[in-house]
Amino acid sequence: MSCTIEKILTDAKTLLERLREHDAAAESLVDQSAALHRRVAAMREAGTALPDQYQEDASDMKDMSKYKPHILLSQENTQIRDLQQENRELWISLEEHQDALELIMSKYRKQMLQLMVAKKAVDAEPVLKAHQSHSAEIESQIDRICEMGEVMRKAVQMDDDQFCKIQEKLAQLELENKELRELLSISSESLQARKENSMDTASQAIK
């Protein structure tokens, strides 16, 4: 009986050490998730500033379209796609952190169930109190992660909507650029025709 109680106490001590490790892992995941959240917030601010920049520089872009419009539009389009892709990668990383926390809690509950069964042979009240404290703390951290996840879902949705609007603006600018090129081509042809007519008239007058 003495050996059995000693073994149970040893197991309880091992469980407490694992709980501390799990708590440290959960804290690390929360810190990483908070960093991801800050990055997404910064990207949202950058994405929100894009429409204002397009409105302020609309006339400049029309002037620039006379020179290298296709290259400029392609560069802007590539930057937007890169931002959207990075947002999606951040969201995937957050989901992985949530899955890791759920796995930690699952193992934690299993260990505590084993400890509660062992409680029949020895009083494990201090360990159970530690379980309640750690469980509440980890549950709170999971709630925080879920809240961050919801914020990031909304941020990704807003980024998608913003991307569609910017795509429409780019398409409109490309269409305007095409029309300007056509007008320029027509004007050049008309000018050339007038020039040729003038030369023919002058030639006939000399004769």
UniProtKB/Swiss-Prot annotation:
Location of the protein in the cell: Cytoplasm
Keywords: Coiled coil, Cytoplasm
InterPro entries with a match to the protein in the record: SIKE (IPR008555)
Claim: Secreted is one of the keywords in the record: no
Principal subcellular localization: cytoplasm
Source species, domain of life: Eukaryota
Any coiled-coil regions, as ranges: 70-102, 162-193
One GO BP: negative regulation of hippo signaling
Pfam families reported in the protein's UniProt record: SIKE
Transmembrane segments: none
GO CC terms: cytoplasm; FAR/SIN/STRIPAK complex
Keyword Cytoplasm: yes
GO MF assignments: protein-macromolecule adaptor activity
Subunit and interaction comment: Interacts with IKBKE and TBK1 via its coiled coil region. Interaction with TBK1 is disrupted upon viral infection or TLR3 stimulation. Interacts with CDC42BPB. Interacts with SIKE1 which mediates association with the STRIPAK core complex composed of PP2A catalytic and scaffolding subunits, the striatins (PP2A regulatory subunits), the striatin-associated proteins MOB4, STRIP1 and STRIP2, PDCD10 and members of the STE20 kinases, such as STK24 and STK26.
Function: Physiological suppressor of IKK-epsilon and TBK1 that plays an inhibitory role in virus- and TLR3-triggered IRF3. Inhibits TLR3-mediated activation of interferon-stimulated response elements (ISRE) and the IFN-beta promoter. May act by disrupting the interactions of IKBKE or TBK1 with TICAM1/TRIF, IRF3 and RIGI. Does not inhibit NF-kappa-B activation pathways. Associates with the striatin-interacting phosphatase and kinase (STRIPAK) core complex, forming the extended (SIKE1:SLMAP)STRIPAK complex.
Record-stated family: Belongs to the SIKE family.
Stated name of the protein: Suppressor of IKBKE 1
Organism, scientific name: Pongo abelii
Native organism taxonomy: Eukaryota, Metazoa, Chordata, Craniata, Vertebrata
